């Protein structure tokens, strides 16, 4: 907001005195801070009181969804997600930055190409989405190491603490990433409005000071020193009050916390356990941070799923549209003002970036699927709530009351929480007292209104709350000067147009609803049947009752048109902001929100703008669709949909109507089994002629890992030697005495890892993996060895990613990968000298384009054969569907062409066949050099792997590379490998440019 000069002088005086002050403007209390940079920012751009944020002086609710750019590395598709978030009625996206991807080598920060954040920020601005930046340095995020690069395993200090070694290690990363964020702050015309230092800094143990104000202040100062001046917000993992304003050093500007109340039991998606619905968040907020707006920086939008889990379809069922209605509206009962859903779009754990407990997909059961589809009902349900919040500013200034089972509803089976407004309307959140109830409950309400206390319905009948449902009833709700005394039907949106006002209400199937309006005007049904609609005129109001119908009815009361919809019909409505200068909708300011039009258009409406006499809509279609536009400006004469002039009609109510035909294109995909597959053995290490002289020697007599002491003569921890990702290989040399009978080995790779062991060329056995096992002790019988002869033990270990570091003091991120211990029977451990390798170069990784985690330590990966156009001319012809006849690891490469039609968004999937009794094998699939599938046949669950356009060349040549690791003496093979697609979407997204896909080039020093 703009301050008067007198107010500004007072603030400057307070600044000079080094004091923070409070001032009141338009009835709201704002806090100004003594820090000059912060104070200057807050008085102009982002301020707050105890109710909400203000952006440029305008009160706003932040409704946000989490989206990680590193999990969708195609820039044009990032814009797609932003536009789908904007279409929900949301105004913000929260994002993490994964440190491990941009500083793979200490001191070398690389944020270019697919890791460049600036196109992500530009796309947010184009879509009109604010950003909450969360760069860590620790992020958790179900990412390898919680976002920590593997080399932190060597830091001589406690991670996430004020130990100097750790703080020094973070400086390079934070100084760079925070400077980039600072460049794109709202103060510089960018979209970033909030900055979160650290992440879920909530739990400590093991004698470490916690919470450590010195540490938290250091992280905050890192951001400030890099130029970050926007407010700092935190996300306590629970509502514990850590680092809340007023707690001293390390306090943030705005306190926030996380909540995942329904948990992560996707195996039982219909079970809502007793007591899981939060009821005390408002009370805790008033105790912990009463001067800041109530913020939940991560509220449950889905669930993770582990190796061997039920799959994300089950997670989306657990956290479905019913969950949203009950839990999100419950959050509204606490007057939440900053609400971020984790996740809104999950994406993909491509290239080994995930943590060990999760698989390639990070779909998360979120509203937008991993393949960017929005057909989950939870997306549409979320759109109803997002648009309601967008047009209900009175919600932010109402006063929340206590939940009650008496006083409002006539049954104790229902609980009502009031948010009472003075002149800005009141809101009543109604739910079942047993929140998990699947019963339908009939009820009447008695609500305080400007017309007195009213028992509703007045015209007879009862209201109904169906099972696992919740409603927000409004009273004295302002529709641009028209007072809605009450409405039991829920508000989707309302708008004031040049020729009148429009209010859109909806209800569930079979429900009866009623509203009352302060007016002396009569009720006229101007569209649809009058059947089921009743009304009554009083001296100062009109009351309307109706039964919800699947057929739209429109009633007119004075200059107000009211659309009466059922919920499923409301799902098809969109409220795009109407741009009049350019094509971008802009950010969600009150002026921009007021400019919106209402469009019924099915699958997706991205944008709307005026150009000359044309109204332009950009929209996506997955079926032939009738398009209707409500509130068309009088200057518009022609309709353009996706750039094409489209004939339209105008009905008596001024609604424009048109039809978009959907004619699905012919999609021709290659048969992957019939490609010209070439094969090379990618475990030459078990051949007698193999030379490992170029391998790093595992000869460190001490580890730099402070978590676990060595139990071997030299360190066999991979991160001691710079190997942090993908498959690890070890070769142990010894000279036999002839008395060795067994070899025991303890390997560690994280949940669901596997390992295999050979003696020279003889297969000894494998650990095929279980989700519950992060390490495994195995003992293998040896054949009779010849005294004096040299033998080599070859060990392959699947590094599933590094552990997260959630609890400060445990330092679990330092949990080593590799060999923990071994025993050659009858021999001292020193009898074996070891070498090891992972990805070629380790921290001096070869592929700077695809990043430090994408490739592992297999021979073919070290050579770069997984990249396009490997030197396969003289390789053997063989397919992964033929596979291997014995234990080992094969590498397969083939190319194919795609020629998919432009203007269509066609989700493509790699599908790996799986039987009920598969042989144990592990597969990696590289697409144009990017690892986009990691499959474990005996664990699962994922068999279908989305691969986005831009990674796949939709109109060009593509290269597939498959590594097949058979962990059984009988070998293994893929039962099938197919490319498939789901419903093509006629899209307005535009051209998608392929990411950089460097081809194979002989690597210097590759072994």
Swiss-Prot record:
Effect after changing residue 806 to F: 43% loss of hydrolytic activity against lactose compared to wild-type. 58% reduction in hydrolytic activity compared to wild-type
Single GO molecular function: beta-galactosidase activity
Principal subcellular localisation of the protein: secreted
Residue numbers binding substrate: 96, 140-142, 199, 364
Subcellular location: Secreted
GO biological process: carbohydrate metabolic process; lactose catabolic process; polysaccharide catabolic process
UniProt-listed Pfam families: BetaGal_ABD2, BetaGal_dom2, BetaGal_dom3, Glyco_hydro_35
E.C. code: 3.2.1.23
Keyword Glycoprotein: yes
Active site as annotated: 200 (proton donor), 298 (nucleophile)
Signal peptide positions on this chain: 1-18
Top-rank EC class of the record's enzyme: hydrolase
Annotated effect of mutating residue 355 to H: No effect on hydrolytic activity compared to wild-type. 58% reduction in hydrolytic activity compared to wild-type
InterPro entries the UniProt entry points to: Betagal_dom2, Betagal_dom2_sf, BetaGal_dom3, BetaGal_dom3_sf, BetaGal_jelly_roll_dom, Galactose-bd-like_sf, Gly_Hdrlase_35_cat, Glyco_hydro_35_CS
A GO cellular component annotation in the UniProt record: extracellular region
Catalytic activity as recorded in UniProt: Hydrolysis of terminal non-reducing beta-D-galactose residues in beta-D-galactosides
Keywords: Carbohydrate metabolism, Disulfide bond, Glycoprotein, Glycosidase, Hydrolase, Polysaccharide degradation, Secreted, Signal
PANTHER family hit by this protein: BETA-GALACTOSIDASE RELATED (PTHR23421)
UniProt name for this protein: Beta-galactosidase A
Species: Aspergillus niger (strain ATCC MYA-4892 / CBS 513.88 / FGSC A1513)
């Amino acid at each position: 907001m703009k301050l008067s000069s007198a107010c500004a002088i007072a603030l400057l005086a307070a600044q000079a005195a080094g004091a923070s002050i409070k001032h009141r403007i338009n009835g709201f209390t704002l806090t100004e801070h003594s820090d000059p940079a912060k104070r200057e920012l807050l008085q102009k751009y982002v301020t707050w009181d105890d109710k909400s944020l203000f952006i440029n002086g305008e009160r706003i609710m932040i409704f946000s969804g989490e989206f990680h750019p590193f999990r969708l590395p195609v820039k044009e598709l990032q814009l797609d997600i932003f536009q789908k978030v904007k279409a929900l009625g949301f105004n913000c996206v929260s994002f993490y930055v994964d440190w491990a991807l941009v500083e793979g080598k200490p001191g070398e920060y690389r944020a270019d190409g697919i890791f460049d954040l600036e196109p992500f920020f530009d796309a947010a601005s184009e879509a009109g989405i604010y950003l909450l930046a969360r760069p860590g340095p620790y992020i958790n995020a179900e990412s390898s190491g919680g976002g920590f690069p593997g080399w932190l395993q060597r830091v001589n200090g406690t991670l996430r603490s004020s130990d100097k070694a750790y703080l020094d290690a973070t400086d390079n990363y934070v100084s760079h990433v925070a400077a980039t964020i600072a460049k794109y702050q709202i103060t510089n015309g960018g979209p970033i409005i909030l900055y979160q230092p650290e992440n879920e800094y909530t739990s400590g143990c093991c004698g470490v000071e916690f919470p450590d104000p010195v540490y938290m202040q250091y992280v905050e100062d890192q951001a400030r020193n890099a130029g970050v001046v926007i407010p700092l917000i935190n996300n306590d993992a629970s509502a514990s009050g850590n680092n809340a304003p007023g707690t001293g050093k390390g306090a943030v500007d705005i306190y926030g916390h996380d909540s995942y109340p329904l948990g992560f039991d996707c195996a039982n998606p219909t079970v809502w356990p007793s007591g899981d619905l939060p009821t005390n968040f408002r009370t805790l907020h008033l105790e912990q941070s009463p001067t800041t707006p109530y913020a939940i920086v991560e509220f449950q939008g889905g669930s993770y799923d582990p190796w061997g889990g039920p799959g994300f379809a089950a997670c989306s069922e657990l956290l479905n549209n019913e969950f949203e209605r009950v839990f999100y509206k419950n959050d509204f009962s606490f007057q939440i003002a900053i609400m971020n859903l984790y996740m809104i779009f999950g994406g993909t754990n491509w290239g080994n970036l995930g943590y060990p407990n999760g698989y390639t997909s990070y779909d998360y059961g979120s509203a937008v699927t991993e393949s960017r589809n929005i057909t989950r009902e939870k997306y549409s349900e979320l759109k109803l709530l997002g648009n309601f919040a967008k047009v209900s500013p009175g919600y932010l200034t109402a006063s929340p009351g206590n939940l009650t089972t008496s006083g409002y509803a006539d049954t104790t089976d229902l609980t009502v929480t009031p948010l009472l407004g003075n002149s800005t309307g009141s809101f009543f959140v109604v739910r079942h007292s047993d929140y998990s109830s699947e019963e339908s409950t009939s009820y009447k309400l008695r609500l305080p209104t400007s017309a007195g206390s009213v028992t509703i319905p007045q015209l007879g009948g009862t209201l109904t709350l169906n099972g696992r449902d919740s409603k927000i009833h409004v009273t004295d709700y302002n529709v641009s000067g028209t007072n809605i005394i009450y409405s039991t039907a829920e508000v989707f949106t309302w708008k004031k147009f040049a020729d009148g006002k429009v209010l859109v209400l909806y209800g569930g199937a079979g429900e009866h609803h009623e509203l009352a309006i302060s007016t002396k005007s009569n009720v006229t049904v101007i569209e649809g049947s009058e059947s089921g609609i009743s009304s009554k005129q009083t001296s100062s109001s009109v009351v309307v009752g109706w039964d919800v119908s699947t057929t739209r009815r429109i009633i007119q009361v004075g200059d107000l048109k009211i659309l009466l919809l059922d919920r499923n019909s409301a799902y098809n409505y969109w409220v795009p902001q109407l741009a009049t200068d350019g094509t971008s909708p802009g950010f969600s300011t009150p002026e921009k929100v007021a400019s919106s039009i209402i469009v019924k258009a099915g699958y997706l409406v991205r944008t709307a703008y005026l150009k000359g006499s044309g109204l332009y809509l950009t929209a996506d279609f997955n079926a032939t669709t009738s398009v209707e536009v409500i509130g068309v400006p009088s200057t518009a004469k022609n309709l353009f949909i996706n750039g094409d002039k489209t004939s339209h009609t105008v009905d008596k109510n001024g609604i424009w109507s048109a039809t978009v035909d959907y004619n699905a294109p012919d999609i021709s995909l290659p048969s992957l089994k019939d490609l010209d597959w070439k094969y090379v053995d990618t475990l030459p290490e078990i051949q007698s002629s193999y030379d490992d002289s170029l391998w790093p020697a595992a000869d460190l007599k001490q580890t730099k890992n402070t978590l676990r002491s060595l139990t071997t003569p030299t360190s066999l921890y991979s991160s001691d030697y710079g190997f942090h990702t993908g498959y690890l290989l070890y070769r142990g040399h010894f000279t036999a005495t002839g008395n060795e009978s067994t070899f025991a080995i303890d390997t560690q790779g994280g949940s669901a890892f596997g390992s295999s062991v050979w003696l020279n060329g003889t297969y000894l056995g494998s650990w095929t993996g279980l989700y519950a096992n992060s390490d495994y002790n195995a003992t293998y019988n040896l054949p009779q060895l010849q005294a004096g002869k040299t033998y080599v033990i070859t060990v392959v270990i699947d590094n599933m990613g590094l552990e997260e570091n959630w609890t400060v003091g445990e330092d679990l991120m330092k949990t080593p990968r590799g060999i923990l211990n071994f025993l050659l029977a009858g021999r001292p451990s020193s009898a074996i000298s070891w070498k090891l390798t992972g990805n070629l170069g380790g921290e001096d990784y070869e592929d700077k384009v695809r990043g430090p985690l994408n490739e592992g330590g297999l021979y073919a990966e070290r050579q770069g054969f997984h990249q396009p156009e490997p030197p396969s001319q003289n390789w053997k012809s063989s397919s992964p569907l033929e596979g291997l006849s014995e234990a080992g690891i094969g590498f397969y490469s083939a190319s194919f062409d795609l020629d998919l039609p432009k203007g269509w968004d066609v989700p493509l999937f790699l599908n790996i066949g799986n039987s009920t009794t598969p042989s144990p094998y592990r597969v990696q699939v590289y697409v144009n050099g990017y690892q986009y599938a990691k499959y474990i046949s005996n664990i699962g669950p994922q068999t279908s792997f989305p691969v986005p356009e831009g990674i796949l060349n939709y109109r060009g040549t593509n290269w597939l590379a498959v590594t097949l690791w058979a962990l059984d003496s009988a070998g293994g093979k893929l039962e099938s490998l197919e490319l498939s697609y789901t419903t093509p979407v006629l899209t307005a997204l535009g051209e998608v440019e392929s990411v950089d896909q460097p081809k194979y080039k002989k690597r210097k020093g590759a072994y």
